[in-house]
Amino acid sequence: MNSLAPNAVLQFGQSWLDRFLPPRPQGRVFLVGGAYKCLLHGRPPRDLDLFCADVNSRREVLVSLRSHGARTIADNPPYQETLSLDGLSIEVAYDTTQSTLEARIDSTDIALSAIGCERGPAGDRVLVHPLAHVSAARREILLLTPLVNWKYALYTLERMHRYAEELGFVVPAEQEEYVWQLFLAQPAPERWSMIRRYKLVSAQSGPISERAMSLCAEVSA
């Protein structure tokens, strides 16, 4: 059985979107990202990542969430506003530049995050990147290269290891090495900027930032 088959992804997306959105809202919202790992490990999601096609769609989603009892627990512009609904964390991105599900999927860096369900006036539809199927079949965490969000590659590496731990998968050595080679290929000011960005978005910021700083020192020596 293919856990990431379109019908399974659609049923999963609908089961969660139905909790706070009508079947055919005026705007369009995309439930994209790591929540679909639940189809592989069988546990409920800890959080949902919502992206909207435009500002009006985002406003509609927030109004609908609050009408269902959601409350804001963190606001971190220009990245996301985080709401809590019945113990579930829901992150609503500020970025609305990707106006289609295809564009949103193309903006991800990890294959198992390149899965999404769109809800809009025309109903629901899903999209699963082909490499997500490969990742699941191999039980490996794979990158979508070249990385679109390469400036946040260190955080992507952290997420890769978190995904692997949650799923019992592995991070192939060549995938991890790709990130470090990308990091080392940058000029020194950009390498330090990548470290600063990582520390801003990471809740851990331990071994990865330490290795990054060590590599910077080695290159400078």
Language-model segments: what does each one mean?
Residues M1-A221:
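Catalytic cores of the polymerase beta-like nucleotidyltransferase superfamily
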